[in-house]
Every structure is written in structure tokens, then in C-alpha cells.
Amino acid sequence: MAKKQEYGNESIKSLKGADRVRKRPAVIFGSDGLEGCEHSVFEIMSNSIDEAREGYGNKICVTRFLDGSVEVQDFGRGIPVDYNKNEDKYNWELLFCEMYAGGKYDNGGDNYEFSLGLNGLGLCATQYASEYMDAEIHTDGYKYTLHFEKGENIGGLKKEKYDKKDTGTRIKWKPDLDVFTDINIPIEYFQETIKRQAIVNDGVKFILKNQTSASKFETFEYCYNDGIMDYVKEIAGDTAFTTPQYWECERKGKDREDLPEYKLKIKSAICFSLKNQLKEYYHNSSFLEHGGAPEKAFRSCLLYTSPSPRDYAAS
């Protein structure tokens, strides 16, 4: 006889705190496997990239350690972690321990005009999904440090005077095998992801360090001063039979008449090659594997503006 299933009022449960991510990581990261773990790493990188895109810092360092831990360091403004009068809480509690808390919800663009991160989810979710996380922030003349273990803060916020002029954020963490089935992210993921971010973030230098033994690291640097234009020239090389062309424009748009305006920036580069074939599209610097709407828009624009054979015949 089949076991009788009891399903009553007491059967309903609410996940709280770190369990909201630790028990269901795929809801946030898309998977509880290696892909989800990779996604969590990209979320921390995204916050640093957003700072650089706004003009705060032009270098981002990413370190891959042998034990599966990762460190991301930027030289931006530094995450605000001190007391927030409007929320009557410390910002570190909001950013590291609460979902949907962040500085990217203002469509007016006062904090970030264009953002790559998950808007208040990525940092907190990655912290929740970590075996441990350490954060060090330099901002406003202070050094702040935080330590977390399995989604829980240990020791509160530590704050001390910092006399040096540099600002920025350094976060080191180890994805938790209790959350993800695999945390051994291959070096190729870091190389491919970071190179793509260097391509679409003009002039930002990305330094990737990969630990190969207890005391040795190999280093890779990625920087495209002219962004996608440099990349197109690199791919075409001496096989190009047209001069690389570049277009850039900024506009404002609305999804509906009664909704607020948002800013739109478009960058395009194109070159025809005798040998190499490549099409890549990005949205908010996120690589679009299948092209999506940006590819359709670019193809339509290119066909619409290209002269027809009749135009050549007439001339």
C-alpha cells in the first residue's frame, strides 16, 4: 500500500536567510552545478565592472586559487558598508545579507547609468552560497573588513582609519560544495569571460592570476583601449578587405508612454574579411550567445542602409 502523504496547513514552509539560496541555488544562479558556480563568480566580477564602467578605477584583478576559492579586487569607490539612515541599518547587512538591496534601482542613473550586475541579488546570493567570504573595503578614509561563513556573519563590521589614498573593494570567497555539486571552475572559463569583458569595456585592464602550485601563479592581462574596434581589427588581421567601421550613439527611450525614460548607448564595429567569419553581440556587456534582439536590430539596420544593386547600376 502506498504511503499516505499528509499535506495540511503545517506543510507550508518559508525559507529564511541563507537557506533561500543554499537550498535552492538554481533559482538565482540557474543551476546547482558548475554553471551555477560560474554564474556566482560572474556576479562578483560584474559589480567591479560596473564601477569601472562609471569611470571609477581602470583595473580589475581576478585570482583563481587551487582550492577553488576566487578573489576579485577593484579600485573603484568602495562598497558603502557603513550606517544607512534611510534604511536604519548598516549597508553591509543590506548588501551582503538581504536580497534585493543595492544601488542600481534608480532608473534616473544617479548611481549607475548602465549596470551589468543582478541589481541587489548577486553579492548577497554569492555570499549565501559560499563556504566563507572575506571582504575588505577602502572608502571615505577607512578600511572596513567583514567575514562570513556559510551565509552567516562572524564578528560584525570592523572599521579602522586608513591613511592611504587608494579606494576599492577586495572580495575573496570559496563556493560551497554543500550548495554546488562542483566548484572546480576551469581556467578557460575565466580567460574567455574576462577577455570578453575587456573587449566591451574600453581601456579597463583585467589581470587574471591563476595559482598553479603552492607558491606559483601564472598571470594573464587583457585590455582593449579602443574596445570592440580593436577586437575587430585583431580578428580581421591581414585578411580584411574593407576598412573597419565604427559607430556609436546615445539615445533615450521608453518601453511604454507612461513609464520613465532610460538611457541607451549603442556601439557597433564591422569589417569584412576574406577568411574569418565572426559575429558577436553583447547587452550591458553580457555576451549574447545567440545574438537575440541586438543581432536582429543590427542586421535590419545594415540591410536598410546598404545600397541596392540598382543604385550602383544607376551610377
Predicted regions span which residues?
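Conserved short strand/loop->alpha-helix "switch" segment adjacent to the catalytic nucleotide/phosphoryl-transfer site
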Residues: 23-41, 113
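A conserved short beta-strand within the histidine kinase catalytic ATPase domain
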Residues: 58-63
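Single conserved hydrophobic/aromatic residue that forms the stacking wall/gate
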Residues: 304-315
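Alpha-helix capping/hinge segments and adjacent helical runs
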Residues: 17-18
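Short beta-strand elements
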Residues: 264-274
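Conserved ATP-binding N-box helix of the HATPase_c
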Residues: 35-56, 124-127
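Short histidine-centered catalytic/ligand-binding loop motif
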Residues: 179, 183, 282-294
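GHKL-type ATPase core
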Residues: 2-11, 66-91, 102-236
